[in-house]
């Protein structure tokens, strides 16, 4: 058994540190933590825009009332199970939730929410995310100890901001950090 104290990061946002994670899917990523227990962790990257999709055709919504495409951005949530889709959304929508957080956010993963969004009856804010990020027991804690991630409180307005490319820089500003002051060397004082 470990002497270390476990800090649950569910509902928090991980901010990739600059110059440490220098390439790949996690470079300048922001991850909303869905679950963090001693058995591991799961999160969704919410600033990796990959394309736009038509909800009606993607989910094969059969309804003649929707005559025009309902285009929504699609984000890459992580390297695990790209065939799984999730809606990270505001908690004003509460039908068949997969997860409900106490910070005005929820997660759904069903056809009903896509139909409701297509009909304009869905949540006020939402992101459609495919795939997710997962850590084995102790793996995220090791990454935090080696300064791969910074942790910040979640902010609904921040997650649903319009420009995904600027979210990471805005997260650093929110934390009071200037990217140019980061060293490419890692360590703890």
Curated annotation (Swiss-Prot):
Its cellular-component GO annotations read: cytosol
Offer one Pfam family short name for this entry: DUF179
Q: What intrachain disulfides are recorded?
A: none
Q: Origin, by domain of life?
A: Bacteria
So what family is this one in?
Belongs to the UPF0301 (AlgH) family.
List the protein's name.
UPF0301 protein RPR_01165
């Amino acid at each position: 058994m470990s002497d270390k104290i476990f800090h649950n990061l569910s509902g928090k946002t991980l901010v990739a540190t600059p110059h440490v994670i220098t390439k790949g899917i996690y470079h300048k990523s922001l991850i909303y933590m869905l679950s963090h227990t001693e058995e591991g962790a799961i999160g969704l990257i919410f600033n990796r825009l990959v394309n736009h999709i038509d909800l009606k055709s993607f989910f094969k919504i059969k309804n003649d009332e929707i005559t025009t495409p309902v285009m929504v951005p699609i984000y890459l949530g992580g390297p695990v199970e790209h065939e799984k889709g999730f809606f990270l959304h505001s908690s004003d929508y509460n039908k068949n939730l997969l997860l409900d957080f106490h910070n005005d956010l929820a997660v759904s993963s069903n056809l009903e929410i896509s139909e409701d969004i297509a009909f304009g009856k869905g949540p006020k804010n939402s992101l459609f995310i495919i795939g997710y990020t997962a850590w084995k027991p102790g793996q995220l804690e090791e990454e935090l100890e080696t300064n791969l991630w910074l942790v910040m409180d979640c902010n609904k307005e921040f997650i649903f901001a319009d420009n995904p490319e600027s979210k990471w820089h805005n997260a650093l500003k929110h934390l009071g950090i200037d990217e140019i002051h980061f060293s490419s060397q890692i360590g703890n004082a």
